[in-house]
Amino acid sequence: MDEIRDFLRSRSVANLTVVIINVAVFLILSCFGDTENADFMAAHGASYTPYIVQDGKYYLLITSMFLHFGLSHLFNNMVVLIFMGDILEKKLGKIRYLLIYFGGGIAGNCLSVYMVIKV
């Protein structure tokens, strides 16, 4: 138990908060359906181009940043985020780290939407 407490205390606050939100969202969605089912995930905030472009649901560009299609997707992303995010937050500070996290996520989702429209 002490190892877990020490590990959590050594984490950067903003990054740890992002990780906790990602895991919490995954656990909540897992209680209600299959996180590997595209229809279920689209109904719960995944980035889906027709919803964004035709229906104007631009908030999906943000909500989708916290969704993971299955446990392995969540696990791999969180392992990288825990270690790389801590380094980045300690180097840049909380505000700049969060700007990069959200800016990168939104930009990536916009690029994905653009590529779907273009093809």
Regions found by a protein language model. Give the residues of each.
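N-terminal TM1-TM2 helical hairpin plus the immediately adjacent luminal interfacial "cap"
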Residues: 11-119
